[in-house]
Design a protein with these regions (language model features):
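C-terminal capping/extension segments of zinc metalloprotease domains
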Residues: 5-7, 16, 20, 35-75, ...
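C-terminal segment of classical bacterial N-terminal signal peptides
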Residues: 24-35
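Peri-catalytic and regulatory segments of divalent metal-dependent proteins
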Residues: 40-180, 225, 245-248
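Residue-level signature of catalytic and energy-coupling elements of molecular machines
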Residues: 97, 142, 214, 259, ...
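Solvent-exposed coil/turn segments that connect beta secondary-structure elements
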Residues: 102-103, 126-128, 137-139, 145-147, ...
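Post-HEXXH active-site segment of zinc metalloproteases
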Residues: 171-200
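Short glycine/threonine-rich beta-strand-turn micro-motifs
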Residues: 327-346
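C-terminal partner/receptor-binding element of secreted or periplasmic proteins
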Residues: 349-363
């Protein structure tokens, strides 16, 4: 997604743009233009007709090495991002993001210690649409609008975990290189590098396999954190629910990616596997060992379907961690399985006691 203000000034000021970030939107991820290289890099010396392909490849490699791999370059890139997009310094929002990023970094570090070689830079920008992206140099930005759609940290963590999955696999740099290489192949026959810049700005170049890989990594990261793994499915249910009431937040849409429903259902399958094939959910009803357990009611701004995936996540975690060997019991209005909270009954739900008794008969 392009920034609304200063875009043409930005193009004139900078000699090149490499962008390969992805943004959480209903049904897909959308291109997020990343800030451009500083003019002193020397793109001006290679833009023009008749540039040899080998020279262009060398310049591209030099660009990526500086702005994706070097500490100096990626910090320079990050500062340019903040200038272009603007920074939201809201204390409460930034505190939440600091906590989520710290938790995700620890979770990722437990399975991929390379994260500590290039720690993520991140900031909240002022855009009011539903959006977050990771681009070159492990530089991330989160739209203010994300918080108007997602209100709990578990779902926000899924969004950011997906973006960090792209970063860990270097998808942004691979996407930028692929985009530019398609143009560079024709450089010796007259294609200008100026057209390459336009190609990078206007194309995502994040493949479906990359998207699926980032989705899978988000699940792995969440299951190595204290966040509810059911949030991986719940977030997509919420996006589908909110798209009906907040369509202006989801105007940018790309149709050549898996749908929200497909992503949700893929995560439900992962949760089934994570539970050692004991629990699943469909149409708002959670099943344990193939038998109906509960159909949660809507609560607050959360639909019953969205809420069901959080219950599913708690049950999956209980079975994964062996808490199912214990009897279900009640703590206040909360159904417990061992030391794992499963569901807190609201006024419109069945009583916690009744649910605990049912769970003990089918678990």
């Amino acid at each position: 997604m392009q920034a609304k203000n200063g875009w043409h000034t930005w193009q004139k000021k900078m000699a090149a743009v490499l962008a390969a970030g992805v943004i959480m939107v209903p049904g897909a991820y959308v291109l997020a233009p990343a800030p451009v290289a500083h003019a002193e890099f020397g793109w001006g010396s290679v833009i023009g007709a008749g540039i040899e392909g080998a020279m262009a490849h060398a310049q591209l490699s030099k660009f990526l090495k500086k702005y994706n791999d070097s500490e100096e370059g990626r910090q320079e890139f990050f500062e340019e991002m903040k200038k272009e997009y603007g920074v939201n310094n809201d204390y409460a929002l930034n505190s939440r993001i600091d906590t989520i990023m710290a938790n995700l970094t620890a979770a990722i570090g437990s399975v991929d210690p390379t994260i500590y070689d290039k720690p993520y830079n991140y900031f909240i920008n002022n855009d009011t649409s539903f959006n977050a992206f990771c681009t070159l140099g492990h530089n991330m930005s989160i739209n203010t609008g994300l918080f108007s759609v997602l209100t709990n940290d578990d779902e926000i963590a899924v969004v950011l975990g997906h973006e960090m999955g792209h970063g860990q696999k270097d998808h942004p740099a691979k996407g930028a290189r692929r985009s530019l290489n398609m143009q560079i192949l024709g450089a010796a026959t007259g294609t200008t590098l100026g057209s390459i810049v336009t190609t990078v700005i206007n194309n995502r170049n994040i493949t479906k396999p990359m998207e699926r890989e980032a989705d899978a990594l988000a699940f792995e990261y969440i299951t190595h954190s204290n966040y509810n793994p059911g949030a991986t499915a719940a977030v997509w249910q919420r996006v589908m629910d909110k798209e009906k009431t907040q369509p202006s937040s989801f105007q940018q849409f790309i149709s050549d990616h898996p749908s929200d429903g497909d992503r949700r259902d893929t995560y439900v399958k992962k949760l089934y596997e994570y539970s050692n094939k004991h629990v699943t959910a469909k149409d708002g009803t959670i099943k344990v060992n193939g038998k109906d357990f509960v159909t949660p009611a809507a609560s607050g701004d959360m639909s019953g379907a969205e809420r069901s995936y959080f219950v599913l996540g708690n049950l999956a975690a209980a079975y994964h961690n062996g808490q199912n060997k214990n009897q279900a019991h009640v703590d206040g209005k909360t159904v417990m399985l061992g030391n794992q909270p499963i569901m807190t009954s609201t006024y419109d739900d069945e009583s916690a006691q009744k649910l605990a008794e049912r769970l003990n008969t089918i678990k």
